[in-house]
C-alpha cells in the first residue's frame, strides 16, 4: 500500500509539502502490486532506534538518521498513517498528522542528535556499519567520525548530491513571494 501511494503522490519527494498543481502521476489509479521480495528471513520493525539498537544483530547495518529539525514523521506522515491505519486528526494543506507537532525525536535537535546517534552506534551488533549523513546536519562530520571510530576503522565516501528542492527554488513567504536567495546547489 505504501509503494502504491508513493507512485501516485503529488509531492516533491517528501510529504511535508505538496506541489502547487497536481502532478500527472497523482491522477493515476492506485495500483497495488506485490513487491519483489528477496529470499531469506527479513524483519520490519517500527520502533525508536535508540531503544531497539541493542536488539539488532546483522552482518550489515545501514543507518540513515534524520540530520536536522525535519522529522521523518513529518516528512513521511502519510506512510505513518497507512501503517497505523488510525485515521488521525490532521492540519494544513499537507494534511499532516496533528501528533507531528508533539512526537519529536532526539535526532531532530542539536543537543539531542549526538547522544542519540552515539547510543545507536554503540549498541548495534554488526561488523559492518554504513551511515548516510548530510553535510548540512546538526552533527559535525568530525563528531560523527569520532563516534564511528570507537567501533574500528572508518572509511568516508563523499557523494555529491543535489540539495533538496527548497534550496534550489529559493525561500518563499506564505503569499508565495520569493523572500530568500538560492544557496549552493549541491551537498
Annotated model-derived regions:
Residues 105-152:
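Conserved Class I SAM-dependent methyltransferase catalytic core
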Residues 71-80, 112-117:
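A short, conserved alpha-helix within the catalytic core of class I
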Residues 59, 75-78, 144-146, 171:
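Short, glycine/charged-enriched secondary-structure capping and boundary segments
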Residues 139-187:
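C-terminal catalytic and target-recognition region of SAM-dependent MTase-like enzymes
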Residues 1-76, 87-103:
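SAM-dependent nucleic-acid methyltransferase catalytic core
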Residues 86-94, 127-134:
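Conserved beta-strand signature within the Rossmann-like core of class I S-adenosyl-L-methionine
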Residues 45, 130, 155-157:
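Hydrophobic/aromatic beta-strand patches that form the interior of the parallel beta-sheet core
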Residues 83-87, 169:
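Long, charge-dense
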Amino acid at each position: 500500500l505504501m509503494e502504491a501511494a508513493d507512485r501516485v503522490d503529488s509531492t516533491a519527494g517528501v510529504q511535508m509539502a505538496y506541489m502547487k498543481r497536481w502532478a500527472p502521476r497523482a491522477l493515476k489509479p492506485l495500483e497495488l502490486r506485490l513487491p519483489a521480495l528477496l529470499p531469506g528471513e527479513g524483519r520490519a520493525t517500527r520502533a525508536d532506534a535508540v531503544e531497539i539498537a541493542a536488539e539488532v544483530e546483522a552482518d550489515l547495518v545501514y543507518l540513515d538518521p534524520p540530520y536536522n529539525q525535519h522529522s521523518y514523521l513529518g516528512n513521511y506522515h502519510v506512510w505513518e498513517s497507512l501503517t497505523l491505519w488510525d485515521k488521525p486528526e490532521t492540519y494544513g494543506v499537507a494534511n499532516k498528522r496533528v501528533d507531528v507537532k508533539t512526537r519529536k525525536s532526539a535526532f531532530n535537535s542539536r543537543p539531542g542528535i549526538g547522544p542519540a546517534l552515539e547510543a545507536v552506534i554503540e549498541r548495534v551488533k554488526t561488523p559492518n556499519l554504513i551511515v548516510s549523513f548530510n553535510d548540512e546536519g546538526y552533527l559535525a562530520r568530525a563528531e560523527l567520525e569520532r563516534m564511528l571510530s570507537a567501533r574500528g576503522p572508518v572509511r568516508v565516501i563523499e557523494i555529491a548530491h543535489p540539495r533538496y528542492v527548497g534550496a534550489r527554488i529559493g525561500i518563499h513567504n506564505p503569499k508565495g513571494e520569493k523572500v530568500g536567495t538560492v544557496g549552493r546547489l549541491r551537498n
